[in-house]
Each structure stands twice: as C-alpha cells, then as structure tokens.
UniProtKB/Swiss-Prot annotation:
N6-(pyridoxal phosphate)lysine modification, residue list: K199
Residue positions binding pyridoxal 5'-phosphate: A75, S76, W100, T155, D175, Q198, N239, T240
Record carries keyword Transferase: yes
Keyword annotations of the record: Amino-acid biosynthesis, Aminotransferase, Cytoplasm, Pyridoxal phosphate, Serine biosynthesis, Transferase
Organism field: Streptococcus sanguinis (strain SK36)
Necessary cofactors: pyridoxal 5'-phosphate
Top EC class for this record: transferase
Record-linked InterPro entries: Aminotrans_V_dom (IPR000192), Aminotrans_V_PyrdxlP_BS (IPR020578), Pser_aminoTfrase (IPR022278), PyrdxlP-dep_Trfase (IPR015424), PyrdxlP-dep_Trfase_major (IPR015421), PyrdxlP-dep_Trfase_small (IPR015422)
Keyword Phosphoprotein: no
Protein name: Phosphoserine aminotransferase
Annotated cofactor note: Binds 1 pyridoxal phosphate per subunit.
Lineage of the species this protein comes from: Bacteria, Bacillati, Bacillota, Bacilli, Lactobacillales
Length: 363
C-alpha cells in the first residue's frame, strides 16, 4: 500500500533528498564523520551553511542588502524577536487572517507590557472563522510605524495572500512558513521574511530569516540569542546552530533548483491544488470553507463533508487506506490536504479517487 503524508508539518520530504542524506549519513564528504557529528566550526560545515545561503539567495533572488539567517526556536520565537528588534519605541500593525497571525499578535501584546511599543490590530477575520483575508485602508497605518505583520499562507484555514496589500510605505514583515519556495514573491517587497523549515525547507529545527540590512538594530536587545544584529554579524554561528537541519535544507534547496526553481514549484503546486479544488467544487458532498477563489492556498486545502460524523468516518477510512495525517486541525475539524512542494501529483489523484468512492458510499 502506498502511503501519502498530508501532514501540515513536519511534512513530506523529497525522496531524492532522503536518499542522498541516507547515502551521506555515515561518512559526509569523505570526512569519516556523519553530518550530525561535524563541528559547526569545521570547514565541512562552513561549506554547508554557505552553500545553503547561496542556494536560497539564488532561488528567491534575494538582493545583496538582505541578510539570511538560520536560527533556532521555530517561527514562533520570531513572534517575540520581531518586536524586540524592530518595534521598540514605535508602532507595529498586525493583519490577522488566521490562527498563527493571531498568535503573533497575542505575543506582541504580551511583550508590550515589558518593552515600549504599541501593537495595533490592523484588521482581523476571526469573526468569519478566518475564511477570508481581511481588508483594510492603508491610510489607517501610521507611516512612521515599524512594520505591518502578515502571514502569507494560513495552514489551518487554507487562505493565502499572493498580492501584497499597500501599507503606506511601512515595511512588511511576513510569516512565510508554509508557502516559502512554493509560490513566487519579490523579496524586496518585504522588510523581513521568516519561515519555519518543517513544511517546504526540511525537517523541524531551523528557522530561516531574511532581513533587510537597514532593519538590523544597533541598540542592544533583551537577549543576545534574540538579537538579529548579533546573529547576522556571527553568520548564524553565535552559538551551535541546528547543523543537521541546515544540511537537510541545503539538500532541499538543491532539489528545488534541479527541478526548475520556485517558478516550477508554483506551477506544480497550482496543478496539484487545482485538481483537488476543481473536484471539491463540482461535488455536492464536499465543501471548501474558503470564501474567495483568489485567496485559496496552494499548500493547504481544508474541506468538509456534510457532517462531523461523516468527517470522522472519512478520516478513519482514509488513514486506513494510506492517506496519513489528513485530519483537519483540531480547532476547525474536517479534513486538510497539505500539498507542499515534495507532495506527489499522483497522491492528489489517488485522494480524489478515494473521495469519489467515499461520496458514493455515503451519499
């Protein structure tokens, strides 16, 4: 039985990457050591991290005036690092279009009790259960504000921002965890991009931060580990970094490049997601909660059947049939197909065949 992993993260990795990691696992580059054993100060690892950065710069066309960091703590740590480094003494706006955006805003509010800055809720679609991206008037934004924070892809709710909103000249800070390298964006349209690795970059353990140099603060931050300037000045080696996760990210970057880059990834992702969306649309049994087609995620596709009881039955039977981790997030229920870069087209076709069978048997 073929197993398809629909997990929202940690997620499916390219088989080619796993095989290469397996082949190099015991003896990396004739060093006589595993990658997991390499000193982060060794030439071997220095080559790995520099090549990882070079590949990411090429794939995303990152300008020279941006720094690339490989950090620890997951994207959630960035919820604190961003205001600590960028917002002290100023205003920070938050566009909340999903659960993760709300967590970022909530963390900022908590932090504002201890450092001098003002987090402002720019707009939220929570009252609509995050079924759409909320709109706002850019004139509401103070042009002197530190940043506008948004999430480019909402993994739980299945919405995405492809065309960035106008922000009255204020830098955009984006959580791009679930569609980095899966959809094309211009890096220069952002002040800062951050992304946890465990969806399109590699295994959990490393977080990529891409920050414009003029946003690196010379003022001391609460903690050296949480200071972008210190991390940048030390080439992400201020302390021992997640070496194996960075190595795996490098292999994934190589894989994306070999397949044709981010443009090819987006083309494939739109084909995969398009098949599933088209099937759901023509079905009287399944429904997508996302209100507007242009806001549909190509990475995470939530859907429901006519009842929670049928959802539970679907999840049980789908799991038994090899469609793993397809259950929707506990906060929304239903089902969710996460179709990240490494997820195969055949997996979508097989899922649709299963959905057709389930619909026929339960209508």
């Amino acid at each position: 039985m073929t197993i398809y992993n629909f997990s929202a993260g940690p997620a499916v990795l390219p088989k080619e990457v796993l095989k290469k990691a397996q082949a190099e696992f015991l003896d990396y580059a004739q060093s006589g050591m595993s990658v997991m054993e390499l000193s982060h100060r060794s030439k071997e690892f220095d080559d790995i991290i520099k090549e990882a950065e070079s590949l990411l710069r090429e794939l995303m066309d990152i300008p020279d005036n941006y720094r690339v960091l490989f950090l620890q703590g997951g994207a959630s740590t960035q919820f604190s690092m961003i205001p600590l480094n960028l917002a002290q003494g100023g205003k920070a706006y938050y566009l909340v279009a999903g659960s993760w955006g709300k967590k970022a805003y909530t963390e900022a509010v908590k932090l504002s009790k201890f450092i001098p800055f003002e987090p402002i809720l720019l707009a939220s679609s929570e009252d609509l259960n995050y079924t759409e991206i909320p709109s706002f008037d850019e004139k509401e934004i103070d042009p002197q504000a530190a940043y506008v924070h948004l999430t480019t892809n909402n993994t739980i709710e299945g919405t995405a921002i492809y065309d960035l909103p106008a922000t009255n000249g204020v830098p955009i800070v984006a959580d791009m965890s679930s569609n980095i390298l899966a959809a094309q964006y211009r890096v220069e349209d952002f002040g800062l991009i951050y992304a946890g690795a465990q969806k399109n970059i590699g295994p959990a353990g490393v977080t990529v931060v891409i920050i414009r140099e003029d946003l690196l603060d010379d003022e001391p931050v609460l903690s050296s580990m949480l200071d972008y300037r210190i991390q940048a000045d030390n080439g992400s080696l201020y302390n021992t970094p997640p070496t194996f996760a960075i190595y795996m990210a490098k292999l994934v970057f190589e894989w994306v490049k070999e397949l044709g880059g981010v443009a090819e990834m987006e083309k494939r992702n739109r084909e995969k997601s398009g098949l599933l969306y088209d099937f759901i649309e023509q079905s009287d049994f399944y429904r997508s909660p996302v209100r507007y087609k242009e806001q549909r995620s190509v990475a995470n596709i939530p859907f429901v059947s006519p009842s929670p009881e049928l959802d539970a039955k679907f999840n049980k039977e789908a799991t038994a049939a090899g469609f793993k981790n397809i259950k929707g997030h506990r906060s929304v229920g239903g089902m969710r197909a996460s179709l990240y870069n490494a997820f195969p087209l055949q997996g979508v076709k097989d899922l649709i065949a299963f959905m057709q069978k389930f619909e026929k048997e339960n209508s």
